[in-house]
UniProtKB/Swiss-Prot annotation:
The gene is rnhC. A divalent metal cation binds at residues 96-97, 201. Pfam families: DUF3378, RNase_HII. This is Ribonuclease HIII. Transmembrane segments: none annotated. InterPro entries: RNase_HII/HIII, RNase_HII/HIII_dom, RNase_HIII, RNase_HIII_N, RNaseH-like_sf, RNaseH_sf, TBP_dom_sf.
Length: 310
């Protein structure tokens, strides 16, 4: 099956939607309209990108968008420095996490599978290292990716996180268990005979990861660990965007629930916010929405004590 993606202007989209009927209700998040035309699925996204999927996708795209430059699959190898494997030339599962360095909010982990046919689509959509993307862009991209990329998203809420930490689990162990579980879930959704590599954004040495993962690694001989993996594998970049999306949406809901802006990270601003929450709702509530072992907790308590002792 061929996949073609174009970035359109509002005028282009209006012209396209005037040529054939589109469905504009009961759509996936991030989608503006969809239809099926002569066996080709056509999806228009809020980002003004349109995706044609089907064996005749290229011909249908050329027919309906005659004035738009044709997307061409790239056969050029990705440039590498120290990297020895050009992962984007292969079919990979990538995994990454979000929230591990944030006092507030959960730990989210995602594994995502990117096939040959989807590499160019992800590039056309603008999939990149999530650290380079705004939260708004992450939400926009993730809501498109989850509609067609096989993936598994796991969320460890603060109650479970604090329970495991109290039981002696390090954060590295938590991440290893979640990464391994997410990867296993994805292998059950794809034809693994077509899988070339499993690429994990490295947060621990391979031996440590394997020791902490609690169960055997699926396809251990195909598993690789890469530092700064998002820039080396588009599968990791996709997983990173989806895991970050889940974290961002959780933080948005938390902000609405607490009725105050909940900052990300572990800065002095976080200490001040935590102190305000202690005053308003108590330390137990703070623990229910945060990672209890972070130093921010003690700093917030000190701020509250100082306020009432001065």
């Amino acid at each position: 099956m061929t996949n073609i993606v174009h970035k359109l202007t509002n005028s282009d989209i209006q012209q396209l939607m005037s040529k054939i009927p589109f469905e504009t209700s009961q759509l996936s998040q991030g989608m503006k309209a969809k239809t099926k035309y002569k066996g080709t699925s056509i999806s228009i996204y809020n980002s003004n990108k349109v995706m044609f999927q089907g064996k005749d996708a290229e011909r249908i795209a050329a027919q309906l968008l005659p004035n738009v430059t044709k997307s061409q699959p790239s056969s050029k190898k990705a440039s590498t420095t120290k990297q020895t494997i050009s992962y984007n030339q292969f079919q990979c599962i990538g995994s990454d996490e979000a929230g591990s360095g944030d006092y507030f909010g959960p730990l989210t982990v995602c594994a995502a599978y990117v096939s040959h046919k989807n590499v160019q689509i992800l590039k056309a959509l603008g999939v990149d290292d999530s650290k380079k993307l705004t939260d708004t862009k992450i939400v926009e991209l993730a809501e498109q990716l989850v509609t067609f990329i096989p993936h598994s998203l796991l969320v460890m809420n603060n109650e479970k996180y604090n329970e495991k930490q109290k039981a002696g689990w390090s954060q590295v162990k938590m991440k290893a268990v979640l990464h391994n579980e997410a990867i296993k879930n994805v292998t059950q959704k794809i034809d693994t005979t077509e899988l070339d590599y499993i690429v994990i954004d490295q947060f621990a040495e391979a031996g440590v990861y394997k020791r902490y993962a609690l169960s055997d690694l699926p396809f251990s001989n195909k598993t690789k660990f890469e530092t700064k993996g998002e820039s080396k594998s588009i599968a990791i970049a996709a997983a990173s965007i989806i895991s970050r999306y889940a974290f961002v949406k959780h933080m948005d809901r938390l902000t609405q629930s607490v009725k105050t802006d909940i900052p990300k990270g572990a800065s002095n601003k976080v200490d001040l916010t935590a102190a305000k929450i202690i005053e308003r709702k108590g330390i137990a509530y703070l623990d229910s929405i945060s990672k209890k072992h972070f130093a921010n907790r003690k700093k917030a308590e000190n701020l509250v004590q100082k306020k009432y002792n001065d």
